[in-house]
């Protein structure tokens, strides 16, 4: 019989936070994870429960309505004290200093073979309906459609001036294998798409779900462009934050890299000139910025617009029998607040 893990035996996580599954095992051993087998609906209930427990420890839902092959995680970054423990930071000041040091000393990511990559245990090329492999959510009854808002884009190599970029883009797959891809003006992705709009070329990317926590943290580093300009190595900084290089793998169907330890990956390309409405309601009215949609991080900014489109060429995933984990990341919570401010705080420092 294995000796039970006691809190007094535990040390700040290092290797344990290099992928999401081992992170959750470590959090559970620490007593910092809520786990439930009760059914939860991605429509309103996931985010409703997260908001009710805002600022508490992470929550894993093992029984998701309509999604028998997925689990859903929220609140991973909801408690700043849990974040500090995950990465071995002694306090808030230590966190800020060490992330600032990671800016100066990125660890170059390592590439592994496709046969080794957990995120490519199963491969589905040319999927008819991407939503089958996702867990779209809805926050409020004002939103007419569910959204995929927690995927982390991965742009590397020549498409990011030789560096690497991580970030969020909300998506709505209204056309099976094609979804809208909202981009914040001024962001790294906006800079990339602006360049390729002029050249009328698609941008190959991957959207990764259930990634190493350090990558989630760096995805919230938007608009720190004095410290993290185009061409920087955000994946390298994430490696420095977790204390070991991030593992990458070549995508199966496009010229892009994926986070090898992700749970699910969408491969494809962004078409800068193929712009479509995010919701059927806004399309029918042919009006941008009037009708409600995903509330966005501030809780009140969500309106439907025309956006570039993401054309999915393949979905790769960990074995679906193991129920890959989607980090749903409800907005206007301490979860996304901590993600969006922690790295920026270090950039200011």
Predicted regions and their residues:
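Extended, highly charged
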Residues: 2-309, 313-349
């Amino acid at each position: 019989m294995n000796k039970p893990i006691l809190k007094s035996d535990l040390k700040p996580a290092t290797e344990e936070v290099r992928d999401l599954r081992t992170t959750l095992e470590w959090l559970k051993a620490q007593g910092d994870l809520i786990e439930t087998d009760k059914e939860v609906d991605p429509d309103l209930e996931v985010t409703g429960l997260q908001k009710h427990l805002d600022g508490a420890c992470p929550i894993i839902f093992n029984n998701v309505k309509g999604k028998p092959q997925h689990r859903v995680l929220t609140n991973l970054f909801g408690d700043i004290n849990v974040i500090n423990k995950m990465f071995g930071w002694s306090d808030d000041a230590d966190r800020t200093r060490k992330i600032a040091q990671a800016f100066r000393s990125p660890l170059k990511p390592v590439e592994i073979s496709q046969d080794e990559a957990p995120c490519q245990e199963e491969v589905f090329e040319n999927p008819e309906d991407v939503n089958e492999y996702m867990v779209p959510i809805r926050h409020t009854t004002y939103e007419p459609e569910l959204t995929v808002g927690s995927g982390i884009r991965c742009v590397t190599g020549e498409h990011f001036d030789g560096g690497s970029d991580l970030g969020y883009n909300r998506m709505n797959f209204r056309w099976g294998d094609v979804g809208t891809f909202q981009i914040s003006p001024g962001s790294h992705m906006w800079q990339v798409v602006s360049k390729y709009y002029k050249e009328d070329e698609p941008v190959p990317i991957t959207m990764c779900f259930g990634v190493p926590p350090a990558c989630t943290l760096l995805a919230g580093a938007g608009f720190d462009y004095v410290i993290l300009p185009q061409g920087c190595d955000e994946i390298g900084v994430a490696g420095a934050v977790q204390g070991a290089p991030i593992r990458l793998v070549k995508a199966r169907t496009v010229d892009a890299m994926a986070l090898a330890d992700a749970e699910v990956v969408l491969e494809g390309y962004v078409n800068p000139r193929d712009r479509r409405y995010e919701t059927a309601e806004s399309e029918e009215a042919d009006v941008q910025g009037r009708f409600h949609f995903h509330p966005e991080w501030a809780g009140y900014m969500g309106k439907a617009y025309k956006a570039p489109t993401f054309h999915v060429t393949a979905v790769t995933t960990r074995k679906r029998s193991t129920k890959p984990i989607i980090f749903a990341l409800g907005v206007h919570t301490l979860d996304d607040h901590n993600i969006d401010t922690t790295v920026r705080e270090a950039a200011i420092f």
